[in-house]
Amino acid sequence: MKPDQGGSGARIQVVSSWDEIEAVFARDPNVWLPDNLFLLQEFLPHDPDQGIVRMEFLGGELLYAMRVKTHGRFNLCPSPVCNPDDGEGACELPDAQPVSTPPVEFYPYLEVPREAVEIGKRIVRAARLDVGGIEYLETDDGRRVFYDIIANSNLRPSVASAWGIDPFERVVDFLVQQLVGAAR
């Protein structure tokens, strides 16, 4: 269950039955405020060593991609502020339960399949996103499932440098081009 409260894995809870969902609401009904909106998302078994894939797009083109090993965590924000290499991120909720798993790991993914990139391009085009991320995973039964469309980017410079780019410079250049084009 994911509440309508932004990212950083905020208040996500794993449930496996309707009884568990009802128990979450009974235990803490205020967690879903102010709008009582939540998303019930299927948990998809996948190889934890492969993790998930996040592709960052800029102007409809792939900027770079990364593999993310979650270690069972839900805060997958790639910003070094949220998920530094030492695991002491600034985006954890103060009331969150302590997590005893290793920190989330981010690796450059230079061999992202062409088909995945093309689907990602179609998604960002359909969503009319100039800058954004798309996440997918490959299930244990071989399906590639795109499950998150991120309408902004939290760039991870260490991953982008493996692609030979500075992501911040690319975004600034893109925005300058947009401003110049709009001024004409």
Describe each model-derived feature in a short phrase.
Residues 6, 60, 139-142:
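Short strand-connecting beta-turns/loops that link adjacent beta-strands
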Residues 134-136:
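Hydrophobic residue at the +6 position relative to the catalytic HRD Asp in the kinase catalytic loop
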Residues 110-115, 124-129, 138-184:
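C-terminal active-site "lid" helix and adjoining low-complexity regulatory extension at the edge
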